[in-house]
Amino acid sequence: MPLPPQLLPYATKLGFPESETLGKIFAILFKDPDSIAIAGVLPGTVKEISARSGIAEERVREVAKRLARRGIISRILHKEDAYRLFPAMIELRDATVITPDYPQELFDMWEILIRKEMPKIVPLLKSLDLPPMLRVIPIEETVESATQVLDVDSARKIIKGASLITAIPCPCRTQANRVGRAKDCPAPKDVNLCLQVNGFAEAVIDRGVGE
């Protein structure tokens, strides 16, 4: 499915400007013309979005709230009525898969995008020498080299220093469950295991997911 022209810059930013798979994902997430038009002019306040898109402020507010609640866009915290797109593909994936009522097709398309299409762009991302989107931190395990994980990155220090902690359904396990890859997963079922801290935790509370 072709990408809507308004969302092509976003698809390019995510690294998939020619992906029909991402086009299908966008078709599920942005289901109406107003959603596409609003997403195409983010970031901004409701007033700014209205001016850029030509959509009435009340309609912008209504659509933006719905998109944020469903994990499609993110509200800019500490700035009234302001929204943004997720800057990385994995953030968009994580935010949407923990929304309970998306169709199975969405999970199937995420599986194709991440497992079949993403590996093709990894060499390009490495050549650009961009900072990593995430890091895997050993939990209370000995790290051979002090340069591998900074002390400020240790899990214990992150949790102790957090001003706010929330727990949400694990996006990775949720995705795996929906596509049949989690048969041997030892994690307990129906337990919120993914911890969010500080700003990410605020976003969880603002959206109303997790605990």
Can you name each region flagged by the protein language model?
Residues 1-24:
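Long, low-complexity, charged/polar intrinsically disordered regions in eukaryotic proteins
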Residues 68-79:
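A short, conserved structural fragment
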